[in-house]
Amino acid sequence: MQNNEIQPSFLIQKVYTKDVSFETINSPACFKEQWNPSSDFNIDINTTKINNENFELDLTITVTTKNNETNVYIAEVTQSGIFTITGMSEEQIDSVLNTYCANTLFPYAKRIIDSSIIKGGFLPLNLAPINFDAIYLQKKSSPKREH
């Protein structure tokens, strides 16, 4: 190994909540109905290069819950982090951001979603762990759409 080679390194600089929203739809009528919920989950990951070594990742989770086909609530959080990554190729950095960094932020986002739903007067959801590696591989293997 040459002396001028940079060793791969990864550092979490900051974890923070960028945005939170919770909307109860059709209240108070929704609290009087028999509870038979179904929920849709949407996950979005956006990365921003701050400079050569620092990157911001935004993990947005949206939960839309219906009861008997009527929308009841929408909960959304954007959990963000700033990460320092050095000594890696662009492809490696992309992989680390979309997998490891997303996994790092998920527990924070999950806690906020759960808290919002409970404070909104609803039963908690059990958000299962997310396989960000599989999501990343699927995204990489999907053909890119042209607009």
Swiss-Prot record:
<keyword id="KW-0653">Protein transport</keyword>
<comment type="subunit">
    <text>Homotetramer, a dimer of dimers. One homotetramer interacts with 1 SecA dimer.</text>
</comment>
<protein>
    <recommendedName>
        <fullName>Protein-export protein SecB 2</fullName>
    </recommendedName>
</protein>
<keyword id="KW-0811">Translocation</keyword>
<comment type="function">
    <text>One of the proteins required for the normal export of preproteins out of the cell cytoplasm. It is a molecular chaperone that binds to a subset of precursor proteins, maintaining them in a translocation-competent state. It also specifically binds to its receptor SecA.</text>
</comment>
<keyword id="KW-0813">Transport</keyword>
<dbReference type="Pfam" id="PF02556">
    <property type="entry name" value="SecB"/>
</dbReference>
<dbReference type="GO" id="GO:0006457">
    <property type="term" value="P:protein folding"/>
</dbReference>
<dbReference type="GO" id="GO:0051262">
    <property type="term" value="P:protein tetramerization"/>
</dbReference>
<comment type="similarity">
    <text>Belongs to the SecB family.</text>
</comment>
<keyword id="KW-0143">Chaperone</keyword>
<dbReference type="InterPro" id="IPR035958">
    <property type="entry name" value="SecB-like_sf"/>
</dbReference>
<keyword id="KW-0963">Cytoplasm</keyword>
<dbReference type="GO" id="GO:0015031">
    <property type="term" value="P:protein transport"/>
</dbReference>
<dbReference type="GO" id="GO:0051082">
    <property type="term" value="F:unfolded protein binding"/>
</dbReference>
<dbReference type="GO" id="GO:0005737">
    <property type="term" value="C:cytoplasm"/>
</dbReference>
<dbReference type="InterPro" id="IPR003708">
    <property type="entry name" value="SecB"/>
</dbReference>
